[in-house]
């Protein structure tokens, strides 16, 4: 049996790794267009700094990733984020996020009453949700995030808390983003309790007392996002992006094989991994709900490539230009992604014969782990892919900048801040990395991770990396109130990187 995997990011590599181990008699070939594996995961070493130019962590409750880390022998390098107060910047002022809130939804009276971010009329309007009835969903049981929370909590809460918290995760228009596709548990909570204030209060109480309600756990876990320094490109976006991309797993047999492999991996997790996970349960809630590795997320990519079984053949610099179904098999046209000539660099000693003379690769099954914009073009006559072709994509940029702590004259309270969409800046958030992930930064340095890109603002596509760097420094200096210049800046532009899961 021959299996072809298209895409060498974390999803494609993981599929190859587990499938190769589960089916040693199968031949598995993976094609990656870029000259490197890892996709958006990109870790750089800058002197004594560990710099993440893509996602910087994953949610600890997503145990599949933790299982993989342990399977690769990297369990001892796992660390949790340090928690701290998160803030919101709104039109010239920095305010703490109200205590006792879950994703901006108040669950405790006094912290919300004392909050400086929301005006008294805004607080009273949010409190009226206690008497609200459930929102009337559309025929698909869906509604946009914006319309849902504006109905429950009012315009001011939407603008100052909900939008910077939730819209930033997906980099999109909160009045278009589907609640059912992104935060379905909010609908479940509302339907069960009648409104969001009652529901989130009950969910928090249930979680704190028993810890057995999935809705409560999900709600509280999602509420940890801002406390951990949430930004535009996070594990949540990655997770949804990769999950939606899996719809292109159009060979049904390979899809069922992948499901079997995932279960096999979970069932065969080592006793040591289980023990390690149990030992961390007591401290995870205290130290943060995100996970990182001391060597950066790219250490997972390096380890999984090195640990591939011998029946898996990995190739970089290979572009899949078309996929056709011919006589019960899949024909995959592959060309060199650099000079358009057939050939590739391989991590294995044996070349793949199907690449010779531009002959198509032939496979019994195909697994695709690329963005929708890549694979939807291969199925132009298939109406089932129309929704992918029409899917909007948003862009963002990440700027990492380092300062000497002894000369830094800004306010370093908490883990970071979010920026309201109505504030006149293209920035959406800033994480203080030396306080969120202290192991990534020397003790005498300050590192800021700044996120750029709002709906309707084209600066990420229009400006050069040098211009984006200057813009990010200038804007965050103004917001945080400091004047010192950074020792260095690293920029990563992610053009049309985030599919928009709109209603």
Model-assigned labels for residue ranges:
Residues 11, 36, 373:
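Conserved Rossmann-like nucleotide-cofactor binding loop
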Residues 469-503:
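Flavin (FAD/FMN) cofactor-binding core of flavoprotein oxidoreductases
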């Amino acid at each position: 049996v021959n299996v072809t995997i298209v895409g060498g990011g974390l999803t494609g590599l993981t599929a190859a790794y587990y499938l190769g181990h589960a089916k040693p008699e199968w031949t598995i070939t993976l094609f990656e267009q870029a000259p490197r594996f890892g996709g958006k995961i990109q870790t750089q070493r800058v002197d004594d700094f560990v710099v993440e130019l893509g996602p910087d962590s994953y949610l600890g409750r997503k145990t599949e990733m933790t299982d993989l880390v342990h399977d690769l022998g990297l369990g001892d390098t796992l660390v949790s984020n340090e928690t701290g107060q998160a803030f919101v910047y709104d039109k010239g002022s920095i305010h703490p996020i109200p205590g006792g809130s879950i994703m901006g939804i108040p669950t405790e009276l006094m912290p919300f009453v004392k909050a400086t971010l929301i005006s008294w009329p805004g607080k009273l309007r949010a409190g009226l949700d206690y008497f609200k009835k459930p929102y009337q969903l559309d025929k698909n049981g869906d509604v946009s995030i914006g319309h849902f929370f504006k109905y429950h909590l009012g315009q001011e809460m939407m603008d100052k808390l909900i939008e910077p918290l939730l819209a930033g995760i997906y980099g999109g228009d909160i009045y278009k983003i589907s609640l059912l596709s992104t935060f379905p548990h909010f609908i479940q909570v509302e339907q069960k309790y009648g409104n969001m204030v009652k529901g989130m209060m009950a969910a928090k109480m249930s979680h704190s007392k028993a810890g057995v309600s999935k809705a409560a756990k999900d709600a509280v876990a999602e509420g940890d996002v801002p406390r951990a320094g949430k930004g535009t490109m996070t594990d949540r976006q990655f997770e949804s992006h990769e999950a939606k991309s899996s719809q292109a797993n159009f060979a049904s047999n390979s899809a069922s094989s992948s499901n079997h492999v995932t279960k096999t991996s979970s069932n065969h997790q080592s006793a040591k991994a289980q023990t390690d996970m149990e030992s961390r349960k007591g401290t995870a809630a205290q130290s943060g709900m995100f996970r990182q590795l001391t060597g950066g997320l790219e250490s997972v990519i390096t380890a999984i490539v090195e640990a591939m079984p011998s029946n898996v053949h990995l190739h970089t610099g290979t572009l899949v230009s078309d996929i056709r179904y011919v006589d019960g098999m899949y024909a995959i046209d592959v060309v060199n992604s650099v000079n358009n000539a057939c050939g590739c660099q391989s991590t294995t000693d044996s070349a793949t014969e199907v690449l010779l003379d531009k002959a198509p690769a032939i496979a019994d099954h195909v697994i695709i782990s690329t963005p929708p914009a890549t694979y939807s073009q291969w199925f132009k006559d298939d109406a089932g892919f129309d929704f992918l072709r029409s899917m909007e994509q948003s862009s963002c940029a990440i700027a990492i900048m380092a300062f000497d702590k002894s000369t830094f004259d800004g306010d370093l309270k908490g883990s970071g801040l979010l920026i309201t969409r109505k504030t006149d800046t293209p920035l959406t958030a800033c994480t203080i990395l030396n306080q969120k992930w202290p192991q990534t930064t020397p003790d005498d340095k300050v590192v800021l991770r700044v996120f750029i890109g709002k709906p309707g603002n084209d600066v990420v596509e229009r400006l050069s990396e040098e211009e984006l760097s200057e813009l990010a420094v200038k804007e965050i200096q103004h917001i945080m109130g400091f004047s010192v210049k950074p020792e260095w800046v690293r920029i990563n532009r992610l053009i049309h990187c985030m599919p928009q899961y709109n209603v």
